[in-house]
C-alpha cells in the first residue's frame, strides 16, 4: 500500500515518525478488486512506506490484531459551518432548512471568534475520523475561511476549501 495515504488512525499513531501497524488490511487496488491481507504496514513520516507479511526489524509495532485497517477516506462534499447542527430538522424541505438553520448560522461566521471556535470543533472531529482528505465548503467570510484553512493545516489534514 505505498502511496499518499495518511497514517492517521488514532492520536498516538499520528505523532509517531516511524512505526508499523499489524492487523487486517483492506484496500481496493483496482475498481473491481477488494483485497484483504494480514500483515504489517510500515509508516514513515505520516506516509505508508510498504506492506509486508513479516514485521520490519527495529521498528515499533502497534498491534491491531482483529481490527480492520483501511486507507483514509476522502469526503468530496462537506459543509464545515453546518457541522454544529448536522442531523437537525431532517423533516424539513431543503429550502426551509437552509432558511431556518443554514443562513442564520453562517452569518455568525462574520465574527472571527465565533468562526475560530466553530471550526475548532469541526476540525477536531474531522481529524479523529477516518477522513484524511476533503473538499470543504466554508462561508462567504474570507477571514473565517482562512481560519478554517489554518486549522486544517495545523491538524495535518489535506483539503480543498472554498465558499
Language model feature labels by segment:
Residues 87-157:
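Alpha-helical scaffold segments that flank or form the walls of functional sites
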Amino acid at each position: 500500500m505505498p502511496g499518499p495515504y495518511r497514517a492517521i488512525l488514532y492520536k498516538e499513531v499520528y505523532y509517531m515518525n516511524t512505526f508499523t501497524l499489524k492487523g487486517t488490511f483492506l484496500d481496493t487496488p483496482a475498481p473491481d478488486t477488494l483485497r484483504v491481507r494480514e500483515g504489517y504496514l510500515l509508516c514513515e513520516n505520516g506516509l505508508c512506506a510498504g506492506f509486508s507479511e513479516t514485521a520490519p526489524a527495529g521498528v515499533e509495532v502497534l498491534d491491531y490484531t482483529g481490527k480492520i485497517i483501511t486507507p483514509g477516506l476522502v469526503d468530496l462534499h462537506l459543509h464545515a459551518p453546518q457541522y454544529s447542527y448536522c442531523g437537525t430538522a431532517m423533516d424539513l424541505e431543503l429550502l426551509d432548512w437552509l432558511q431556518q438553520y443554514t443562513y442564520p448560522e453562517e452569518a455568525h461566521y462574520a465574527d472571527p471568534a465565533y468562526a475560530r471556535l466553530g471550526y475548532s470543533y469541526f476540525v477536531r472531529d474531522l481529524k479523529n475520523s477516518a477522513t484524511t482528505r476533503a473538499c470543504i465548503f466554508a462561508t462567504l467570510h474570507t477571514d473565517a475561511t482562512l481560519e478554517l484553512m489554518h486549522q486544517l493545516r495545523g491538524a495535518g489534514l489535506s483539503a480543498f476549501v472554498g465558499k
